[in-house]
């Protein structure tokens, strides 16, 4: 039995009617088991309950796995930050429009 073990975490902040995901990660041992999907679905529902219009994030263009994950939740690429990361890779700016009540 594992106690007090973090499987995944999402750090985000709200500005006006938008939320920005700053950090979203699932422990490698627990990937492909639905935890990331659960966490993202939970975040989206919470943001919609807060009547937020958009959910935003940045992801490295070279992180194909993360890009595929975000596309499953209908995040679209709305911009690019060239040479954003230390290795020179670009950051893709992603946005998901939310359903407000």
Briefly describe each language-model feature range.
Residues 30, 34:
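Glycine-rich phosphate-binding loop
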Residues 1-29, 40-42, 46, 50, ...:
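Acetyl-CoA-dependent GNAT
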